[in-house]
Amino acid sequence: HDPHPVYQAFMAQDYSENFSRDEVRQTVIPTYMGLIQQLDNHIGRVLAKLDEKGLRENTLVVLTSDHGDYLGDHWLGEKDLHHDPSIRIPLIISDPSDAADSTRGSSSDALVEAIDLVPTLTEYAGAKVCSERMEGRSLTPLMQGGLPSGSWRDYIISEIDYSDRGPRTLLNLHPYDCRARVIRTRQWKYVLHERFRPQLYNLLDDPNEF
């Protein structure tokens, strides 16, 4: 069957066509990995300086990103759509408090969102979390072993806006119609597009979202 119209419009962009070429991927992906190595080295410098200044034991360190990158996966470039290479981001938190000893060095498969960071940092700063204004949830219970990851959240939400992107012209859309909303559970991902048919992925049977 034909690709989804929005997906097809993004695949038709110059950057997607370029990233889909094997010779480009063979050049860009190692370069991208090298940049990650460079970032890792600089993070090491920051942590070493915290140790040198005696600040490591009372400093909360958070490493995250605002988006991923396709790098040619799904025949796409950049970061624009709903697949996991774009919306699934790293989140590493070093909590020096004694309360986090039980989870130190571990990983969690809990469904968390970027908006969870604001209430988390607010709570760590000793300020009141205004739940009526903050949509996220403090991650402290997960980080300090007070809550199993499976009971944390049933779904997460992501939103897409491509009103300033090339596909808007190809699809002849009003800017207000260049939006999609994504709901993801552990098993399912549902993408609701303005003006176009929705998409549904069973992530257990189709983890690569094809």
Which residues does each predicted region cover?
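Active-site-proximal cap/lid insertion segments
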Residues: H1-L111, Y124-R133
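Short, ordered coil/turn segments that flank beta-strands lining enzyme active or ligand-binding pockets
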Residues: N41, L203-D205
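Non-catalytic surface loops within mature trypsin-like serine protease
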Residues: D95-S97, Y162, D205
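C-terminal cap/loop subdomain of S1 sulfatases and analogous C-terminal strand-loop tails that border
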Residues: H67-D73, I115-V118, E123-Q199, L203
